[in-house]
UniProtKB/Swiss-Prot annotation:
This is Replication restart protein DnaT. One of its GO terms (cellular component) is primosome complex. GO terms for biological process: DNA replication, synthesis of primer. Residues 151-179 are annotated as: Disordered.
Length: 179
């Protein structure tokens, strides 16, 4: 167990080697910090102080309440490794970004408020399949993040308009226009 103990009693290593019993007896809390080369080397404790600290550690290790929580809520399933091609590769039809893509995009400075939609991913894959360029998996993800960011910003954050919808005429006449 590595820890730091607060004490107001300290000694140099040489002094401690010569009179360790007297220094420990003189300390009020049973603890002496021993320094070597102006840095704490170790702590010397009386048996009573050691027993106090061990009892305190045991008390802190016990649960504070008798409520037992179901461990299934704290066990995260191990992520199954996705087969990502090693090195550079050309874009292929079944390519998927990593499961934590949004977090990675945020690390790259691209904040995506929503996950990539299947339509956005399909458009990206189709474009880069036709290009035939090769990049590493991380580079493809960075390109996807930038592509999604740019396409979402071009619409002002609005979803793309359905080109197949039939528009209805507006019968409202704005103020200042004759009707």
């Amino acid at each position: 167990m590595s820890s730091r103990i607060l004490t107001s009693h300290f000694s140099g290593l040489e002094e401690f080697l010569q009179q360790h019993a007297a220094l420990l007896a003189k300390s009020t809390d049973g603890t002496v910090a021993v320094f070597a080369n102006n840095a704490p080397a170790f702590y010397a404790l009386t048996p009573a102080r050691l027993a106090q600290l061990l009892e305190l550690e045991a008390r802190l290790a016990r649960p504070g309440s008798d409520i037992a929580l179901d461990p299934q809520f704290f066990e995260e399933p191990a992520a199954a490794p996705v087969a990502v091609p090693m090195g550079k590769f050309a874009m292929y039809a079944g390519w998927q970004p990593d499961a934590d893509f949004q977090r990675l995009a945020a690390l790259w400075g691209i904040a995506l408020s929503q996950p990539v939609t299947p339509e956005e991913l399909a458009a990206f894959v189709a474009y880069w399949q036709a290009e035939g360029k090769v990049f590493h998996h991380v580079q493809w993800q960075q390109k996807l993040a930038r592509s999604v960011q740019i396409s979402r910003a071009s619409n002002g954050g609005q979803p793309k308009r359905d080109v197949n919808s039939v528009s209805e005429p507006d019968s409202h006449i704005p103020r200042g226009f004759r009707g």
